[in-house]
Curated annotation (Swiss-Prot):
GO terms for biological process: (1->3)-beta-D-glucan biosynthetic process; cell wall organization; regulation of cell shape. It is a multi-pass membrane protein. It holds the Pfam family Glucan_synthase. The keyword Transmembrane applies. It is an enzyme of class 2 (transferase). This is Putative callose synthase 6. Probably involved in callose synthesis, but not required for callose formation after wounding or pathogen attack. During plant growth and development, callose is found as a transitory component of the cell plate in dividing cells, is a major component of pollen mother cell walls and pollen tubes, and is found as a structural component of plasmodesmatal canals. Keywords: Cell membrane, Cell shape, Cell wall biogenesis/degradation, Glycosyltransferase, Membrane, Transferase, Transmembrane, Transmembrane helix. InterPro entries: FKS1-like_dom1 (IPR026899), Glyco_trans_48_dom (IPR003440), Vta1/CALS_N (IPR039431), Vta1/CALS_N_sf (IPR023175). GO terms for cellular component: 1,3-beta-D-glucan synthase complex; plasma membrane. SMART domains: FKS1_dom1. The gene is CALS6. It catalyses: [(1->3)-beta-D-glucosyl](n) + UDP-alpha-D-glucose = [(1->3)-beta-D-glucosyl](n+1) + UDP + H(+). Its EC number is 2.4.1.34.
Amino acid sequence: MEASSSGTAELPRSLSRRAPSRATTMMIDRPNEDASAMDSELVPSSLASIAPILRVANEIEKDNPRVAYLCRFHAFEKAHRMDATSSGRGVRQFKTYLLHRLEKEEEETKPQLAKNDPREIQAYYQNFYEKYIKEGETSRKPEEMARLYQIASVLYDVLKTVVPSPKVDYETRRYAEEVERKRDRYEHYNILPLYAVGTKPAIVELPEVKAAFSAVRNVRNLPRRRIHLPSNTPNEMRKARTKLNDILEWLASEFGFQRGNVANQREHIILLLANADIRKRNDEEYDELKPSTVTELMDKTFKSYYSWCKYLHSTSNLKFPDDCDKQQLQLIYISLYLLIWGEASNVRFMPECICYIFHNMANDVYGILFSNVEAVSGETYETEEVIDEESFLRTVITPIYQVIRNEAKRNKGGTASHSQWRNYDDLNEYFWSKKCFKIGWPLDLKADFFLNSDEITPQDERLNQVTYGKSKPKTNFVEVRTFWNLFRDFDRMWIFLVMAFQAMVIVGWHGSGSLGDIFDKDVFKTVLTIFITSAYLTLLQAALDIILNFNAWKNFKFSQILRYLLKFAVAFMWAVLLPIAYSKSVQRPTGVVKFFSTWTGDWKDQSFYTYAVSFYVLPNILAALLFLVPPFRRAMECSDMRPIKVIMWWAQPKLYVGRGMHEDMFSLFKYTTFWIMLLISKLAFNYYVEILPLITPTKMIMNLHIGHYQWHEFFPHATNNIGVVIAIWAPIVLVYLMDTQIWYAIFSTLFGGIHGAFSHLGEIRTLGMLRSRFESIPIAFSRTLMPSEDAKRKHADDYVDQKNITNFSQVWNEFIYSMRSEDKISDRDRDLLLVPSSSGDVSVIQWPPFLLASKIPIAVDMAKDFKGKEDAELFRKIKSDSYMYYAVIESYETLKKIIYALLEDEADRRVMNQVFLEVDMSMQQQRFIYEFRMSGLPLLSDKLEKFLSILLSDYEDQGTYKSQLINVFQDVIEIITQDLLVNGHEILERARVHSPDIKNEKKEQRFEKINIHLVRDRCWREKVIRLHLLLSVKESAINVPQNLEARRRITFFANSLFMNMPSAPRIRDMLSFSVLTPYYKEDVLYSEEDLNKENEDGISILFYLQKIYPDEWTNYLDRLKDPKLPEKDKSEFLREWVSYRGQTLARTVRGMMYYRQALELQCYQEVAGEQAEFSVFRAMASNDENQKAFLERARALADLKFTYVVSCQVYGNQKKSGDIHNRSCYTNILQLMLKYPSLRVAYVDEREETADAKSPKVFYSVLLKGGDKFDEEIYRIKLPGPPAEIGEGKPENQNHAIIFTRGEALQTIDMNQDNYFEEAFKLRNVLEEFNKERVGRRKPTILGLREHIFTGSVSSLAWFMSNQESSFVTIGQRILANPLRVRFHYGHPDIFDRIFHITRGGVSKASKVINLSEDIFGGFNSTLRGGYVTHHEYIQVGKGRDVGLNPISIFEAKVANGNGEQTLSRDVYRLGHRFDFYRMLSFYFTTIGFYFSSMLTVLTVYAFLYGRMYMVMSGLEKEILRLASPNQLEALEQALATQSIFQLGFLMVLPMVMEIGLEHGFRSAIVDFFIMQLQLASVFFTFQLGTKSHYYGRTILHGGSKYRPTGRGFVVFHAKFAENYRLYSRSHFVKGLELLLLLVVYQIYGHSYRSSNLYLYITVSMWFMVGSWLFAPFIFNPSGFEWQKTVDDWTDWKRWLGDRGGIGIPVEKSWESWWNVEQEHLKHTSIRGRILEITLALRFFIYQYGIVYQLNISQRSKSFLVYGLSWVVLLTSLLVLKMVSMGRRRFGTDFQLMFRILKALLFLGFLSVMTILFVVFKLTLTDLSASVLAFLPTGWAILLIGQVLRSPIKALGVWDSVKELGRAYENIMGLVIFAPIAVLSWFPIVSEFQARLLFNQAFSRGLQISMILAGRKDKATSSHK
């Protein structure tokens, strides 16, 4: 038996021999898991088929242990047969574990039903069949029957191995045949159990589902394929060949689609048809689809295909002969497309490739159905081709997949140039030309498309394997890393800006400065030179198009090449012609007056230049005219007329995408007006503030003759002081190019604010506003959120009002209950906020008690103090407050009913009847104040309150309770009759006289018979609680609810009801939709260990949250007081409570499942109508058959309309993993599936399928749902290869799971999002936006939704980020959608038109690196393909954001990287060229333009400081200031002041202030603005400016973009100095120190005036930037200035800096490893990137060149020799340092004496040299300091150049020296940055101030942040669970 686990072929039938004494390894690290239950889940992937057997064994173990043992033995045998040598991963360990277990069970288990195993298993099988299957068919649900049939099938397989075939008795065999026959009907299903019998779920009984299923099952007259099968073919395959249930199975039999794919798409198409068919259809019963249903679905599905055929001038293969069954054929075509799409895997990203496949397969279908050979008769036809269920995958998808994968390998893990490999877009665009038909059908694998220029050999199969040889050319576009892309993509904008700048300079230069000077003939003539500039720029654009697309030329059509060459030739012609013409016109000047007056004269008299310009601008004039008529332009783009095609060919290259994107006239007018106003403001500001004031000083500088320089001037005779002019104008030009972004921020803020106000945003923003408008909320609710037939009713009668209240109360109460379950509100808040569900008992509307709180006590006091004589006056006072009036009437009527119900004695009731009659009569007759003593009311109120308190209290002794109740009630009666009623004794007497049994009346006390059992009745108890609240709540409920988040949600929900949203359709009419969430390895649910694990400060997550959310923690503890909850549940509740406050998958899933909860409530309201009982819905159960039917129907409709799929890509690996985190992720995801039965999980399953002694990996897309205890597999679809290795992770993850989504809409939700029940209720309204008629516009394809950032509650950083993000997702996207019309898709809660997008490439793009920001490309793609994106703010979805500086910076870096890659992409190029001019401006400034402007802001500072340094060091500044007035350079400072606005983050703050003002009031906005400034928001934004500019620039130059996972945890932890240094060294610290050096040099050597306020502002702003970049990470680092942590940080930093690196040493451990990683981008950059990097490094040599001439030792010499000698000194110093370093290495250990002698000699030499320099050459200490300033930058430049030239330097053998130089610089930089921190850490007040700064939000809420920071905690509190 030992051999069995090690590889022998034979397997013994008995386990009597001992197994090897190897320890079980399979169950290691599986805490809290039942081993017997889990073994089925730990099966190695290569043995996956035995998992069901082990599950069955576990299932039946309690029932019959012996049969369970036999099942396990069968599993072991099967495993051994599958992998006899145990070669698969984990197989040996698993078999060993199973063997041990079998040996143990063989001895422990004995047969129970018979004497031996064969009889035992037969008896058990028969019992199982009779007990569960036979009886269960009519009583059990399909999912239960599926499980039972699976068990029965497995049991029979086991039985056959135990019992020889002849000995299986007849009964067993008959049962097994019955199981086999019916098994297909009971397979695990997703939503529709289509073939189930017996008890069918309500969903399959819906008429629309029946009709759709019937249509799909119509296989009449479809020919059957007959194949000559080999004689040994199994019977199952033969049966499968002949049995066809529906159209999809017929297609599968013809083309070989997988079974899982067929089942998946069958349900998909049935649900699509059912949902479309029921819309606007009122029939309750029908069995046929509407003819229009299938036609409409077909039109939508094939709109893209028709477009593709038209573009390629190919005839569509969607053919319909006259005599065909059209609906059947339409369904065949739709099903075929969906089956192709469902199995296409990564090819789904190539929609036109799918069109090509469908085009050919549709032709095949037509051939099969309507060929001349075979009539459509339903007969079989013969064929030699054998089709199995993987034929389509093998012959069609896999070859294309291999091409994609081979190209992806060229990417070399994202390091190769984009031009070296073809991405998804390149391969897809191959199918945009007719040459795609050369691929042929069936696919010709020798076609050019499939042939790589170098075939990849099997040994090169690893993903990043380097491939050799030339790559194949790109298609249509080449992504090249260069900043020229910005000009190439947006050439019209840059040409406009350059021309405008030139025109303004000319006008300012030649005239008086007035814009009217342009009409002067000389000025106008010169202004016309802007067209020469335009011609040159156009030539540049034409050249760039040729150069940058060079790698795609081989794939270009001749017409494309011709166009590029002609464009270049024409541009070149104009670039030559216009300057020549202008030079001619100089001799014959022409003015504007003469020009216009002689226009009709002889052209020969006119300037040739004028005519040339006229012809030059003619195309632009035509384009402008077309721009004004968008429909005409759209028609031209889509036209097939040859003249128009020629014109459009010249205007823009013909492309499949980007046609007809022009907006309607009104939209055009709106965004054109926006931009014209903006550009006028910008240009006027530029002209009058920046350009015009600088003209005069420029002229003066150009006229100065400067002969004295302070350095060696290379061009001493250069005219006009051109260097100074460049130094002064460079910052001005940069600000001019950048400040449009500032004007955009201003205008978008204004327009966005106005648009938001007109959208009714923020009309209800406080609880006071809520109260004042609450009466109108139910009506608004009915109008917006109830189906339209109800909303149209006139609100005139009480019935309608009551109906409004009933519908509203159900939803409102569920909303309140959901907030209570989330612990947002307390029990008291809940009671005060609920609307009574039994509201028909009283004559007035019953409002929530929080509106009526304190109204009764106030009314009582008012009546007590009333001095008037008339009832009417008192009642008028009460009625003046409507809520008080409602409260008084309700209290009186409710009290009356409560008392009547309590009293059992008829006589007592008569007494009370007399009392109430007296009250009613006195009010009618207006003598109330005369009949009643008002002074007695307070006493009565108090006593009633006490009575109700006792009534509601819990009691143990019924007698005591009853006596207390009676006593207090008698007191109440006494007060009424004696203190309140003036004639109380008369009333009592009257009641006694009217008693029918007065003579027989017993001598007993009144009011002793009270029915105390009524309290158990829920509805009655609700009334008592409500009345008690009305009487007892003395204070105003103005602060109910207390929780800020609860307030925000209530006010937003109430406000949204008054906003413009579509009317709600009936549930059956609403669009069906899915939600898709991609998940990788993030936290699902925190474990108990996670909750209590303490960080270095002794803080656990639980403790932190207890302190941050104290009210929610208290509410949670109150909720746990329910004695029914077991302890186990309490610990689970604690984990959930913590997880729901983090950014976890559990939080996201809970939020998304609110959709289903809301749908079920809406369905229930509609189905049940007036019979709806809220208590039944809340319990989701009832004994009433009608109510049961209502609930079942509600669930069915919810299933029909909503699907939620979480794509857990690595769930399968997590399931098998031994890692604790992965394992917990698996168990938590499983728990989510079990908790939410409608949740579906998709994952990629990796299996090793053993064949020929190999275990190749096979990949599947699998869909799961929760079963009884474990997950249940629904669909399994084989993939052509690993799907996630080709593109970016997230879009690939979405793509593999998108096939399992359903419906017409798809919402993409990230796993850091949340949702709210009340918002989920609005979803059907939002989905109606897809059907909303829009004048002149297309229907939307993406609906953008508003987001609420839920992570801004504590630290200032979280608050800044939350506000910044909130402003972007509200006012930012509002303005993008309307008026600018450039909103795309930003990742999170957007809702896609699902069919539109699945037929056009999906919801995102996935090419490696270029599509790093994958989500926005989904929006680009949608827009380019004719989509239309909107934005809606009446609904919101929660979103988490990063809350610490480091995670925020990583996120910003990721986004900046993504924008860098976007700049290179074809999508941005196409949008930039296809949009009209103004929409293109919107597109630029709201996407990559923002990041380029950020970079320009930083470059402006550099340009200013380096320009000033040039002027200072050369001596030019000194000379200019001596000869000129200082006030003449103010324009430069004004321009830089503009730039600093951007730098300080005011651009971010403007939209924030506007949005906060809109939604919370402008007073709050202004206060928040000032608080943000006090909390150093400007430091934060300035710091982020550095992050954006660094990563954006580096990505364009060198690439190296990668997905950066960001922190989703809690923030309060201290980041070490070394960690901050690693993160910010290159992006901020180096640049900050460079600017510091520039400022210091300027301060030392500059001679500038210092009086100007603007100068001071600019200087301060630049110092501010330096300070922010160097110290922001430490200012925003918790405990950043605590002395002990500072000491620890220094120790850690020194250790990190000193440790040597090497292979496998992480960057956190060694500086050397980090240093190598930091240069990674330089290894893979292009030669262009290397040259640019070296060029940029040369700027550091300027310091040395400038400073050496300022030294005293130079003796004022201007000879170049001085600079040369300085290099000798520098190189000598470096050589000495190198000698010391080498000496330490060679002699330091073994020859210590030699090393000391060497050091002494060097020291003596140094002293000698210094002495000579001081004495002979007059060297000073100042010179020494200046030399440090000179040589430090030079050394850094050498280091930078050395890093770029790493390979040659390594070859020279001096790389170690470069490395040591690098380490020395890191030491210096670290010391400079660390020193101020160390000094400040000495002062404890600094640390306290920092804590206040960081956590002001928490302090203002009274939170114990100091305890969190200090790590002190109350153990009792934190351990309380």
